[in-house]
Amino acid sequence: MHLVPDGFRFPVGNILSLWNSWYFGDRVSGISPLRQLGGSDVVRRDKTNLCRARRVFDEIEDIAIQDGLLRAGERMRSVGIRRSNEIAKVAYTKLYRRLYDIDENEDIARYRIGEITYNAIYDKISRQNR
């Protein structure tokens, strides 16, 4: 069984645009949820992006669980697209504030966090964990 069509390239983009593909896939394009992909499902040069995306999305889901945005035993993939997107925005904003040391009372809109790629967030997480 192929999780992605031949010639598939792992997407590079911002977190919120990739969110639904990560958890729900794209049936029209024949792409399974990206979270299900393994190293053998992507070309060599995309393996790094797959690993980086996994780390970032796991971090966001962990925040959602810790903050009670997901109920006990609930996983992001089981809540449906609409609720998943709402949870993602809240949890990602919290992660962004933590990584960039932004006060909770400061207006986050000026930071244009929706434009930040998962690679940039991964780099920030990695530097913080050193």
Give the location of each predicted region.
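Charged, low-complexity regulatory segments of eukaryotic nuclear chromatin/transcription proteins
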Residues: 59, 63-130
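Intrinsically disordered, low-complexity regulatory segments of eukaryotic
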Residues: 1-66, 70-72
